[in-house]
């Protein structure tokens, strides 16, 4: 089946999604084909074409349809060796040493990646969670307790620090996925959600929270960015002055993010990847 015919079949199933059940064998066939493309990295929910990110909505729809097709079942070999009860199997179900070596990435005990997520060569998954439809490109580190949400797009040589959250698209339903471009650094306990794009080489310090409406203020120029961090920007938490209250007293300040500088040699020395960890 060609990509065009697969897309058309998914779109048709989506229009009739209220009637999709575990007995919908024809729909299952095309949805599983789409999920295999996502799992292998041969297709992705968003891709950069001529410098612009384009979302393949039909692939996101395939992910959503899969939840109507599958019943919950016991999944062996869950986190910590405990069984789980879910609709999505582990990406690594049935894998042996040869399959892991062929894939070329590391999976530390406690890491969870669901079937339908793509993990590139040289990636390190510390005890973390990578959801269905996500794309994690080569050389990236997903550190301890970090989460890569459904359909999120993570570039090459990215560092997602401990406890950081990369939001998904499934609930609440989002039009586009979060995108972290090549070489970006996401600081510990930061959160990027609601389709925000973090540009190539950008650095978020610890505890930066970015959603679709978060103001990202350039301290030098006063320019305000919303929904996108410029490439190579260094971003820290900040606050905007609040509007006065009705009685004229100062109102509460509101959270924002602040671009304090552009990545320089000092920044790179603190946020660069360690090639020793990628072997």
From Swiss-Prot:
> Top-down, what is the taxonomic lineage of the species of origin?
Bacteria, Pseudomonadati, Pseudomonadota, Alphaproteobacteria, Sphingomonadales
What the record says about family reads: Belongs to the transferase hexapeptide repeat family.
Alphabetical list of NCBIfam families matching this protein: dapD, PRK11830.1
Record bears the keyword Nuclease = no
Compartments annotated for it: namely: Cytoplasm
Name any one GO molecular function: 2,3,4,5-tetrahydropyridine-2,6-dicarboxylate N-succinyltransferase activity
InterPro entries, alphabetically? DapD_Trfase_Hexpep_rpt_fam, Hexapep, THP_succinylTrfase_dom1, THP_succinylTrfase_N_sf, Trans_hexapeptide_repeat, Trimer_LpxA-like_sf
For this protein, the Enzyme Commission number is 2.3.1.117
PANTHER family the UniProt entry points to: 2,3,4,5-TETRAHYDROPYRIDINE-2,6-DICARBOXYLATE N-ACETYLTRANSFERASE, ACETYLTRANSFERASE
**What are its GO biological-process terms?**
diaminopimelate biosynthetic process; lysine biosynthetic process via diaminopimelate
Q: Name one GO cellular component term.
A: cytoplasm
Q: In which pathway does it act?
A: Amino-acid biosynthesis; L-lysine biosynthesis via DAP pathway; LL-2,6-diaminopimelate from (S)-tetrahydrodipicolinate (succinylase route): step 1/3
**Pfam family membership, one:** THDPS_N_2
Q: Which domain of life is it from?
A: Bacteria
This protein's assembly is summarised as: Homotrimer.
Binding residues annotated for substrate, in chain numbering = 106, 143
SUPFAM superfamilies this protein is in? Answer: Trimeric LpxA-like enzymes
Return the protein name. Answer: 2,3,4,5-tetrahydropyridine-2,6-dicarboxylate N-succinyltransferase
């Amino acid at each position: 089946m060609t990509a065009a015919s697969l897309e058309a079949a998914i779109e048709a199933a989506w229009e009739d999604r209220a009637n999709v059940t575990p007995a919908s064998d024809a729909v299952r066939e095309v949805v599983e084909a789409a999920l295999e493309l996502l799992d292998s990295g041969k297709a992705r929910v968003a891709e950069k074409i001529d410098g612009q990110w384009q979302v393949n909505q039909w692939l996101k729809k395939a992910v959503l349809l899969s939840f109507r097709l599958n019943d919950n079942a016991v999944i062996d070999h869950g986190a910590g060796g405990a069984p789980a009860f879910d609709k999505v199997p582990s990406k690594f179900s049935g894998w042996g040493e040869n399959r892991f070596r062929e894939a070329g990435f590391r999976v530390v005990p406690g890491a969870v990646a669901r079937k339908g997520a793509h993990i590139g060569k040289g990636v390190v998954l510390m005890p973390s969670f990578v959801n269905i439809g996500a794309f994690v490109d080569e050389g990236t580190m997903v550190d301890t307790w970090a989460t890569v949400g459904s359909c999120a797009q993570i570039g090459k040589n990215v560092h997602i620090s401990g406890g950081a959250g990369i939001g998904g698209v499934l609930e609440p339903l989002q039009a586009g996925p979060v995108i972290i471009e090549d070489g970006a650094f996401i600081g510990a306990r930061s959160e990027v959600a609601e389709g925000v794009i973090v540009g190539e080489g950008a650095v978020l310090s610890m505890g930066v929270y970015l959603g679709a409406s978060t103001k990202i203020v350039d301290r030098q120029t006063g320019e305000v960015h919303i929904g996108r961090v410029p490439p190579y920007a260094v971003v820290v938490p900040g606050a905007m002055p609040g509007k006065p209250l009705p009685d004229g007293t100062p109102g509460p300040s509101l959270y924002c993010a602040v671009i304090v500088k552009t990545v320089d040699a000092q920044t790179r020395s603190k946020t660069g990847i360690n090639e020793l960890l990628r072997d």
